Amino acid sequence: MPKQKTHSGAKKRFKVTGTGKIMKQQAGMRHNLEVKSSGRKARLNQDQPLAKADMKVAKKLLGR
């Protein structure tokens, strides 16, 4: 049986922490930034943990 390949799109979008949590980038930081407050942009710029409902699928795509 051949090796399982890591999903290319998933490896670009998700980071796995040392404890095994999967982090993703919050949406909303691509355009129209001039109308958003600096506080809002700071919040949006932080990595967010992936929802538990999506965790199983993401782990499979990442080969974990």
Curated annotation (Swiss-Prot):
Keyword check for Ribosomal protein: yes
KW Chaperone (keyword) present: no
GO cellular component: cytosolic large ribosomal subunit
One of the Pfam families matching this protein, by short name: Ribosomal_L35p
GO BP terms, alphabetized: translation
Keyword tags: Ribonucleoprotein, Ribosomal protein
UniProt cross-references to SUPFAM superfamilies, sorted A to Z: L35p-like
GO MF term list: structural constituent of ribosome
InterPro entries assigned to the protein according to its UniProt record, in alphabetical order: Ribosomal_bL35, Ribosomal_bL35-like, Ribosomal_bL35_CS, Ribosomal_bL35_sf
Family label: Belongs to the bacterial ribosomal protein bL35 family.
Protein name stated in the entry: Large ribosomal subunit protein bL35
Source organism (scientific name): Clavibacter michiganensis subsp. michiganensis (strain NCPPB 382)
